[in-house]
UniProtKB/Swiss-Prot annotation:
Protein name, per record: Cysteine--tRNA ligase
Major subcellular site: cytoplasm
Record localization: Cytoplasm
Disulphide-bridged cysteine pairs: none
UniProt KW NAD keyword: no
Keyword Translocase in record: no
Taxonomic placement: Bacteria, Bacillati, Bacillota, Clostridia, Eubacteriales
Gene source species: Clostridium tetani (strain Massachusetts / E88)
Motif ('HIGH' region): 29-39
Record gene name: cysS
Length: 465
């Protein structure tokens, strides 16, 4: 099994530090708002990586943090007249709702920065004591020039970085690229007592500290969005390796951006959709299939057309499952003839192809293509005169290969009901916008499938006809 290591810029054989076990740290959200679907891509990608590692038999300790003290959080809490803690609690709850709706498995641990303040202060103190950090008037900065390998993750030269950083630089710093690991308290900000006075940690030190405390000096996989390579992950490496003298992570993985109109989707550009907005129209299988339809290191363009295409694809997959379930209930023969024994081996070959694709740097796009090839083959070859055993085997392998991707696990009835509700919601939106043609098209399409809509004072109801 190979994965692309951002640190070495090449695919490497995956060999965890401890046989059969994987320690994995993924940078999580700053909890001041709902997460947008661009963040959602990162969370889905590394949920899939975790699921596949577990499918391969690894015991995975998966840590994803919550940044619950941050400039953005302080500003929003002040704007709303609530505490930063109250804001964090609210959006941690909202994160779980949306992540659960996207079928993202809960992390082994979701640490919060504010729970590790004592450990963070000790981390900063050690860096100061070793001469890697310095204090100026209550602020503590990491001295990047003391770390000779600074820039190794992002492939940037420190001299070039410093030249670019000299605009609006804090004159008190020894070098332009030095970054804050402890910030002096400003009026109205939450703060903790430290050897340098009241203050709070910098963002980069929080992740380093939580990873160290929960996973050890060196972890197997550290992951996050592509935008975190520099400066966040670069700074994590610098402060962590200066503290321990050991490599911080063996493998670094980064997911590419989700774009909208060929620009990165982000809150700062105000060109984003929240995961919750998308989930009002599409269910988890659709969103996950869309997100995983491109390799995680390839940028993906967001569009309604692509989501509609993913919805049709998911419908085809569940239709295949539905047809097989009906066949399994109808057929009586249990024995396998020679042709069917050969066909089971053919289905096993699809599994092997799928594993081959996923073993090649988690190539979900090609793995999904294997599933569709297999479905087409099953649709052509598994019929009403087939053995019950082969029908059940076909069903089980479809579910099995969907599992690492987090799809195809619902009952067919659940899937059908979710899809009908999504179409009803789209019809209601069309009616609100006075798009009567689209509303009628959706109603007529459902009627052709044996679903009759009834508009009542209490809302739209549906029944089978």
């Amino acid at each position: 099994m190979k994965l692309y290591n951002t640190l070495t810029r090449q695919k490497e054989e995956f060999i965890p530090l401890k046989t059969g076990e994987v320690n994995m740290y993924v940078c999580g959200p700053t909890v001041y708002n709902f997460f947008h679907i661009g963040n959602g891509r990162t969370f889905i990608v590394f949920d899939t990586v975790r699921r596949y590692l577990e499918y391969k038999g690894y015991k995975v300790k998966f840590v994803q943090n919550f940044t619950d003290i941050d400039d953005k959080m302080i500003k929003r809490a002040n704007d709303e007249g609530i505490t930063v803690k109250e804001l964090g609690e609210r959006f941690i709850g909202e994160y779980y709702k949306d992540a659960d709706s996207l079928n993202i498995e809960r992390a082994t641990v979701n640490p919060r920065a504010t729970e590790f303040m004592e450990e963070i202060i000790q981390f900063v103190k050690e860096l100061v004591d070793k001469g890697y950090a310095y204090e100026i008037d209550g602020d503590v900065y990491f001295h990047t020039k003391r770390f000779n390998e600074y820039g190794k993750l992002s492939g940037q030269n420190i001299e070039d970085l410093q030249a670019g950083a000299r605009i609006n630089v804090d004159e008190r710093k020894k070098d332009a690229m030095d970054f804050a690991i402890w910030k002096k308290q400003k009026p109205g900000e939450p703060a903790w007592e430290s050897p340098w006075g009241m203050g709070r940690p910098g963002w980069h030190i929080e992740c380093s500290c939580m990873a160290h405390n929960l996973l050890g000096d060196t972890i197997d996989i550290h992951a996050g969005g592509h935008d975190l390579i520099f400066p966040h992950h670069e700074n994590e490496i610098a402060q962590s390796e200066c503290r321990t003298g050991k490599p911080f992570a063996k493998y670094w993985m980064h997911s590419a951006f989700l774009n909208i109109d060929n620009k990165k989707m982000s809150k700062s550009l105000n060109n984003f959709f929240t995961a919750r907005e998308i989930l009002e129209k599409y269910d988890a299988d659709v969103v996950r299939l869309f997100m995983l339809s491109a390799h995680y290191r390839a940028q993906l363009n967001f569009s309604e057309e692509l989501l509609q295409s993913a919805m049709s694809a998911v419908e085809r997959l569940y239709n295949a499952i539905y047809n097989l379930e009906n066949l399994a209930n109808e057929v009586k023969r249990n024995d396998l003839n020679e042709e069917e024994k050969k066909y089971i081996k053919k289905l096993d070959e699809y599994r092997e192809k799928y594993i081959e694709k996923m073993d090649d740097d988690f190539n979900t796009a090609d793995a999904i293509a294997v599933i569709f090839d297999m479905i087409r083959d099953i649709n052509s070859n598994v019929k009403s005169d087939s053995s019950k055993k082969i029908i059940e085997y076909a069903l089980s392998i479809i579910r099995e290969l969907g599992s690492p991707l987090g799809i195809l696990q619902k009952s067919t009835e659940e899937s059908v009901e979710d899809e009908i509700q999504q179409l009803i919601d789209r019809r209601e939106k069309a009616r609100t916008e006075k798009n009567w043609a689209l509303a009628d098209e959706i109603r007529d399409g459902l009627k052709e499938r044996g679903i009759l809509l009834e508009d009542t004072p209490q809302g739209v109801r549906w029944k089978r006809i």
